[in-house]
UniProtKB/Swiss-Prot annotation:
Residues binding chlorophyll a 6: H245, A254
Taxonomic source organism: Zea mays
Keywords on record: Acetylation, Chlorophyll, Chloroplast, Chromophore, Magnesium, Membrane, Metal-binding, Phosphoprotein, Photosynthesis, Photosystem I, Photosystem II, Plastid, Thylakoid, Transit peptide, Transmembrane, Transmembrane helix
Similarity comment: family membership: Belongs to the light-harvesting chlorophyll a/b-binding (LHC) protein family.
Localization, UniProt: Plastid, Chloroplast thylakoid membrane
Record GO terms (molecular function): chlorophyll binding; metal ion binding
Binding-site residues for chlorophyll a 5, renumbered to this chain: K212, Q230
Domain notes: The N-terminus of the protein extends into the stroma where it is involved with adhesion of granal membranes and post-translational modifications; both are believed to mediate the distribution of excitation energy between photosystems I and II.
Chain sites annotated for binding chlorophyll b 2: R103, I152, L181
PANTHER family: CHLOROPHYLL A/B BINDING PROTEIN
UniProt-listed GO biological process terms: photosynthesis, light harvesting in photosystem I; response to light stimulus
Pfam families: Chloroa_b-bind (PF00504)
Protein name: Chlorophyll a-b binding protein M9, chloroplastic
């Protein structure tokens, strides 16, 4: 009796075959091609952050959310006055951009504050202010990572630029492609080796973690914007600006600087 073969063909399983009893298909040869599924919504039935009864942007004072914002995805508070999420493809793209920018902003905000915090507590490692640190590469001695010459000693801005392009490009390509074998279904939440703490093991808890990530990420993006403005206006790091404000809140605040700010000075 001849046997039938069902060949599962995909980027992850290319070349593998699964034998199927002939009683199911007779003499037929069935070929099935596996494609990456779209990311599933993170709706959580018991969470206040999802579904039609979720928390909205103004609480009980919120108006009726747009029909296309159904509470399926994390961070949906029913607010879209500009209609940016009306088109499903644009909505999916913007969701991905927001999550990626949120993660970079959280890392960036920590990187802006932590070196300055260490320097203010006596740790010596060169320039601690985030927007001044990179310029040390143009100094005669170059740039020592963490102020330690035994770590990475950089002297060429072109070499750093090339490393950034190659390394970050490779990481982003790895993410978009779903890993080396294309086995990752959702590039935003790949799981597996990218989740060593097992945060995604419990679907209910994972749905809430996604909301927390976006909340903190949105705050981090606003923080980074504030750090940029502070750097342009005051020429100081975020912690030094905070210390100045606490020491003299009347003369060191956004209003005082806005009314006295002269570009280029």
């Amino acid at each position: 009796m001849a046997s039938s073969t069902m060949a599962l063909s995909s980027t992850a399983f290319a070349g593998k075959a699964v034998n199927v009893p002939s009683s199911l298909f007779g003499e037929a040869r069935v070929t099935m091609r596996k494609t990456a599924a779209k990311a599933k919504p993170a709706a959580s039935s018991g969470s206040p952050w999802y579904g039609p009864d979720r928390v909205l942007y103004l609480g009980p004072l919120s108006g009726e959310p747009p029909s296309y914002l159904t509470g399926e995805f994390p961070g949906d508070y029913g607010w879209d006055t500009a209609g940016l999420s009306a088109d499903p493809e644009t909505f999916a793209k913007n969701r991905e951009l927001e999550v990626i920018h949120s993660r970079w902003a959280m890392l960036g905000a920590l990187g802006c504050v932590f070196p300055e915090l260490l320097a203010r507590n006596g740790v010596k490692f060169g320039e601690a202010v985030w927007f001044k640190a990179g310029s040390q590469i143009f100094s005669e001695g170059g740039l020592d990572y963490l102020g330690n010459p035994s770590l990475i000693h950089a002297q060429s801005i072109l070499a750093i630029w090339a490393c950034q392009v190659v390394l970050m490009g490779a990481i982003e390509g790895y993410r978009v492609a779903g890993g080396p074998l294309g086995e990752v279904v959702d590039p935003l939440y790949p799981g597996g080796t990218f989740d060593p703490l097992g945060l995604a093991d419990d679907p209910e808890a994972f749905a809430d973690v996604k909301v927390k990530e976006l909340k903190n990420g949105r705050l981090a993006m606003f923080s980074m914007f504030g750090f940029f403005v502070q750097a342009i206006v005051t020429g100081k790091g975020p912690l030094e600006n905070l210390a100045d404000h606490l020491a003299d809140p009347v003369n060191n605040n956004a209003w005082a600087y806005a009314t006295n700010f002269v570009p280029g000075k």
